[in-house]
Amino acid sequence: FSTQQGLKITEIIESVNEGLKSAEAKRDIHTGILVCAMRNLDQETNLSMLKDARELLGSGVVGCDLAGDEKAYPTSGFRELFEWARKNDMPFTIHSGECGSTLNIQTAIEYGARRIGHGIAMKDAPELMKLCADKKIGVELCPTSNLQTKAINSIEEYPFKKFYEAGIPMSINTDNRTVSDTTCTDEYMRLVDAGMFKEAMCQKIYMASLAASFADDSVKQEVFSRWPIM
């Protein structure tokens, strides 16, 4: 929307980064920008955005993503986009398997995704779960969002425990703060209340989240060093 008002992609990103840096100065946090290509947009528009964002990789931008309607726009149609990202050393995650298709997860892995957004569809695909575990591909779980989009029918059928026991690196996320009206604490507590998440799991999930993040090594080390006192 902002580009339609005359702003350049780099200007938009730099403005967002200014806000994030202001938050970092006030709060004890680290931030990074994940730019997101959209499935419903044409290849030229998405690729142009990635090329502009790549100029700011390491200066606010940490990686890229692909989101949108998986059924209407399957991941197989975005090979060129992620070949470019891979060749230009731009880390990426791909929303995959939020709907019922495991094929989009498989394709994302073939493209070289370091993380999978949601991945719910592989809950009944043990070979795919094993592949994610073996390749240490992080899966971004978003319980509230998955309930709202009906990726699952109830929290009782959420595959957190199944993924955990399969050895898949996972992070617990909000997906979005405002649309779902949730926080990371709320998401953890939803799993606790469902009897899925135990305190003993905390360090493993925390460390898996940190390892799968696109933060640079210095940030990861700084956050890691604080674990014993948190």
Feature map (PLM): residue ranges:
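Short, acidic/polar
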Residues: 42-53, 99-106
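Acidic (Asp/Glu)-rich catalytic clusters
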Residues: 17-28, 51-59, 82-86, 128-134
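Flexible glycine/proline-rich, aromatic-decorated loop/lid segments
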Residues: 155-165, 179-181, 187
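Charged helix-capping and loop-helix junction motifs
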Residues: 10-14, 47-51, 76-83, 153-162
